[in-house]
């Protein structure tokens, strides 16, 4: 369900447009981002060492404003880096055991995993640092 509407933004000031756009959050993901719903799934896909690709995990909550704002960028990166990285999303309210297992206490949190080990962690909607880590660990 879409909470915001861009049709009303035509006369809004830019800051209002950002707030309204951020309220649009679709929990579905592109075909290049997989949802993880359990600790067992997390261990099978992210911790698995057989795949040498970088794995980026986005821990989010549906009520989290910064999570909503950065979600379109995550989708874009998933398309851009699809050959060199796998992308996952975890709703911390639906899979709290995964958040606990990873020590995640703030949203959004982005974990970068390579060869079954966490190589970097970005807390907050910080596109510059996320992009930096994607570039660094996909080379």
Q: Could you say what each language-model-derived stretch is?
A:
Residues 43, 47, 75-82, 88, ...:
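Amphipathic alpha-helical interaction motifs in eukaryotic regulatory proteins
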Residues 53, 60-63, 106:
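Short pre-active-site segment immediately N-terminal to redox-active cysteine/selenocysteine motifs
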Residues 58-60, 112:
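Structural cue for short, hydrophobic secondary-structure segments
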Residues 1-32:
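N-terminal mitochondrial targeting presequence
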Residues 105-106, 111-139:
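Non-catalytic, surface beta->alpha helical segment in thiol-disulfide oxidoreductase systems
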Residues 35-54, 96:
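A short beta-strand-turn-helix
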Residues 64-67, 110:
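The canonical Cys-X-X-Cys-His
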Residues 36, 59, 70-97, 104:
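Thiol-based oxidoreductase modules, predominantly thioredoxin-like and allied folds used
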């Amino acid at each position: 369900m879409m909470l915001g509407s861009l049709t009303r933004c035509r006369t809004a000031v830019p800051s209002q447009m950002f707030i309204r756009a951020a309220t649009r959050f679709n929990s579905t993901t592109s075909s290049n981002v997989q949802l993880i719903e359990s600790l067992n799934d997390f261990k099978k896909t992210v911790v698995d060492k057989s795949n040498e690709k970088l794995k980026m995990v986005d821990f989010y909550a549906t009520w989290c404003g910064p999570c909503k704002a950065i979600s379109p960028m995550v989708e874009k990166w998933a398309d851009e880096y699809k050959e060199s990285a796998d992308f996952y999303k975890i709703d911390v309210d639906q899979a709290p055991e995964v958040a606990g297992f990873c020590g995640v206490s703030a949203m959004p949190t982005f974990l970068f995993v390579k060869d079954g080990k966490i190589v970097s962690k970005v807390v907050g909607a910080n596109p510059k640092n996320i992009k930096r880590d994607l570039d660094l660990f996909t080379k």
